[in-house]
């Protein structure tokens, strides 16, 4: 364990990466350490904040699936509910996957389509402002319709709403303010997307059965806010993105082995066609997304350097 020390100014000294790395010092596998940390963190947070029940928007994707599985681990199936909110761009498979997931977890799943809500809002917007909603604005409207629905559920029934964004998305701003960022706590905000996949597989292995359907783990990540949309249409592939982020966001706060791997990966990427541009683009996205992170709910920390007090950057700055 690490020890908090007072500095000469009377404030606690920052906890360094080296200090934090001593926490899982009993030979615990990394994914099991993450599982236990998140489960304990949620259980403690909910108790101290007076919440007994949890609600999560279930998209049929891996982030919401893992969040639901961890919530059930922390508070029990009777205290967790999912809400699936299909739109015009939601695949039938996503709804079916949500049904299968919640059946495996033993939790109740509500279905609340947002098609009519989005259509009505878009029509009224055009009538008032003379321009139709299209492109990113229409995509974000769907995310905000879901976020508003979930917050209303939270208000009406007293459930704690969990956000489902992971560290990869949070780093580069691949999220919608007042949409999928709505909630009271984020469980995955310090896990990279590649770790989300790894922890999901570990959850199934730990349970000895398929809690998270394999089809959810295998499917290409997608926000499903536009026809045929995939995450890698907008971002580098997650194995590439995550190594850049480890090098840029956490750097030497990482273990020496993990930092050496990330640094070598980035160095090799620089030598490839388009590599320098990819690295620069990711760095710019991280800087420009600070304003989103400042408005996001608190996120449980499991890695050497988390956003928030672990990485303080100005919101308004010239990043070109």
Regions found by a protein language model. Give the residues of each.
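ATP/NTP-dependent adenylation/nucleotidyl-transfer catalytic domains that generate, transfer
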Residues: 6-59, 64-320
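CN hydrolase (nitrilase-like) catalytic-core segments centered on the catalytic cysteine
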Residues: 1
